[in-house]
């Protein structure tokens, strides 16, 4: 009986604490739906499609509103004006990374994606500088992407125009580009180590996009005490870190300090320079996690976009025909596509942009946080508050993009057929937390897609009208449904 009384008292205290925290903070924060004790607004949000729920709530509470995930307040920004004001106009104040408990377990605050403060700034600055020195957006990395595009075309030829699921092959190409940047090595598509790495990356994007992960991140005790797919994700990350550590040891034994070959060499050189400046942010643990982040951000996002792009091109054969006509006119058949071609191919450029806009790969991006107490639109948001960005509300804005739910390359073309930029184009987020590999991803999408369409016609196994382009999961990332196609050599 005594234990029951204690339990009831504990629960009562928890409920009172929950109510007090919510009521004391709500006077400062933007308005929002009334949260339930302990669980907050979790029942009012469709976990399978958070973005749709945010759109519905914005119609009631406006472009800036507050939700509670458990006891934790989260300020939501919906629509271009609110997102721009926060991420661009007040970029420094909104540059923090929001709480992501599962990532905390995986990387302990290291790396480039989930770190904060001085650690994040130094690692991000170093990573950007190193990638630029190796030619991100310049010639040397373009050579690597072109080489991988040629290998991709050869792998597709091996399908002999038979029906195939493109998931694996389209994942190999961007993964190999990242391998060449980090390890100075590309792998054969049949290499077992490479296959294991690909498998872990593919599993992780599916797990991260599941409703279960949303629950884990908002009720963090689940991570330590409950079984579930989150444990598989943590094991996959541990596998990748151990693999990278092996490569780091190989580099330490063979590195030429006067001739760095890749990202690992550059990081080890930085560690050597910083060894007298303790404590340094440049450690082996930081290198492991930064490399894992580059793999995660640079492989599955690009391969998922490529997979979605081919599905949309199957669905819209008239678009595919126009792209192939432009390829034939500008590039021809006797040389590989290059980035200089893009400025002469406005329709193809528009298609690449429209694919990214339409699929809305990361509907709410990753959570941000404010780095200080900030007054925002007459609300006071306390330091450390998590900020949720609705990228969907920007990419699918119906004023900027008429009929935003329709796939239409003319969203990025003017009346004369010239490519038209849009400030609403934010597939990689915006501001200080914009994806480090934005330029690389854009290069890969253009070169891989043009190389495929230069060499193959795409054949659907069903009537294009019957192809479903609805994402199968739409949590962290929008993942396309399973499909097969035939690559018919031109």
Swiss-Prot record:
Molecular function terms, GO-annotated: (R)-limonene 6-monooxygenase activity; (S)-limonene 6-monooxygenase activity; (S)-limonene 7-monooxygenase activity; arachidonate 11,12-epoxygenase activity; arachidonate 14,15-epoxygenase activity; arachidonate epoxygenase activity; caffeine oxidase activity; estrogen 2-hydroxylase activity
Catalytic EC class: oxidoreductase
The protein's name in its UniProt record: Cytochrome P450 2C9
Record function comment: A cytochrome P450 monooxygenase involved in the metabolism of various endogenous substrates, including fatty acids and steroids. Mechanistically, uses molecular oxygen inserting one oxygen atom into a substrate, and reducing the second into a water molecule, with two electrons provided by NADPH via cytochrome P450 reductase (NADPH--hemoprotein reductase). Catalyzes the epoxidation of double bonds of polyunsaturated fatty acids (PUFA). Catalyzes the hydroxylation of carbon-hydrogen bonds.
The family this protein is said to belong to: Belongs to the cytochrome P450 family.
Phosphoprotein recorded as keyword: no
Effect listed in the UniProt record for changing residue 359 to L: In allele CYP2C9*3; responsible for the tolbutamide poor metabolizer phenotype
One GO BP annotation of this record: xenobiotic catabolic process
Lineage, top ranks: Eukaryota, Metazoa, Chordata, Craniata, Vertebrata
Listed cofactors: heme
Pathway recorded for this protein: Lipid metabolism; arachidonate metabolism; Steroid metabolism; cholesterol metabolism; Terpene metabolism; (4R)-limonene degradation
Keywords for this protein: Endoplasmic reticulum, Heme, Iron, Lipid metabolism, Membrane, Metal-binding, Microsome, Monooxygenase, Oxidoreductase, Steroid metabolism, Sterol metabolism
Gene label: CYP2C9
Compartment(s) where it occurs, according to its Swiss-Prot or TrEMBL record: Endoplasmic reticulum membrane; Microsome membrane
Classification via InterPro entries: Cyt_P450, Cyt_P450_CS, Cyt_P450_E_grp-I, Cyt_P450_sf, Cytochrome_P450_fam2
Effect of substituting residue 251 to R: In allele CYP2C9*9
PANTHER family noted in UniProt: CYTOCHROME P450 2C9, CYTOCHROME P450 508A4-RELATED
Factors inducing expression: By rifampicin.
GO cellular component, as recorded: cytoplasm; endoplasmic reticulum membrane; intracellular membrane-bounded organelle; plasma membrane
């Amino acid at each position: 009986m005594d234990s029951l009384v204690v339990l009831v008292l504990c629960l009562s205290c928890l409920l009172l604490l929950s109510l007090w925290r919510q009521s004391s903070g709500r006077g400062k924060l933007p308005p929002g739906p009334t949260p339930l004790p302990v669980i907050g607004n979790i029942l009012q949000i469709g976990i399978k499609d958070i973005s749709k729920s945010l759109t519905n709530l914005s119609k009631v509470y406006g472009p800036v509103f507050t939700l509670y995930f458990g006891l934790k307040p989260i300020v939501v920004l919906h629509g271009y004006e609110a997102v721009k004001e926060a991420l661009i106009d007040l970029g420094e104040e909104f540059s923090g990374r929001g709480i992501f408990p599962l990532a905390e377990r995986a990387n302990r605050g290291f790396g480039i994606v989930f770190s904060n403060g001085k650690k994040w700034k130094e690692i991000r600055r170093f990573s950007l500088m190193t990638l630029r020195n190796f030619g991100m957006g310049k010639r040397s990395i373009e050579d690597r992407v072109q080489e991988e595009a040629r290998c991709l075309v050869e792998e597709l030829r091996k399908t002999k125009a038979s029906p195939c699921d493109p998931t694996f092959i389209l994942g190999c190409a961007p993964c190999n580009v990242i391998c060449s940047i980090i390890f100075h090595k590309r792998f054969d598509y049949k290499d077992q180590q490479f296959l294991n790495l690909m498998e872990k990356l593919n599993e992780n994007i599916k797990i991260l996009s599941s409703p279960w992960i949303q629950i884990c991140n908002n009720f963090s005790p689940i991570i330590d005490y409950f079984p579930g797919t989150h444990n598989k994700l943590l094991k996959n990350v541990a596998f990748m870190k151990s693999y990278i550590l092996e490569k780091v040891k190989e580099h330490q034994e063979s590195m030429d300090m006067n001739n760095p070959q890749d990202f690992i060499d550059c990081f080890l050189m930085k560690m050597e320079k910083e060894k007298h400046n303790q404590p340094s942010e440049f450690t082996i643990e930081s290198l492991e996690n930064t490399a894992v982040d580059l793999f995660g951000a640079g492989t599955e996002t690009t391969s998922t976009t490529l997979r979605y792009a081919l599905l949309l091109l199957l669905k819209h054969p008239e678009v595919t025909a126009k792209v192939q006509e432009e390829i034939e006119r500008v590039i021809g058949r006797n040389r590989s596509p290059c980035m200089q071609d893009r400025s002469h191919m406005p329709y193809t450029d528009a298609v690449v942009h429209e694919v990214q806009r339409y699929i809305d790969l990361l509907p709410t991006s990753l959570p941000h946080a404010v780095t200080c107490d900030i007054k925002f639109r007459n609300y006071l948001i306390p330091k450390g508050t998590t900020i949720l960005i609705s990228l969907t509300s920007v990419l699918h804005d119906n004023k900027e993009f008429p009929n935003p739910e329709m796939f239409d390359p003319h969203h990025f073309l003017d009346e004369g057929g010239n490519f038209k930029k849009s400030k609403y184009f934010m597939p990689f987020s915006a501001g200080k937390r914009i994806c480090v590999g934005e330029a690389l991803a854009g290069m890969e999408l253009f070169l891989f897609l043009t190389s495929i369409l230069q060499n193959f016609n795409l054949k659907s196994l069903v009537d294009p009208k019957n192809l479903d382009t609805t994402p199968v999961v739409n949590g962290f990332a929008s993942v396309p449904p399973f499909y097969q196609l035939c690559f018919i050599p031109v």
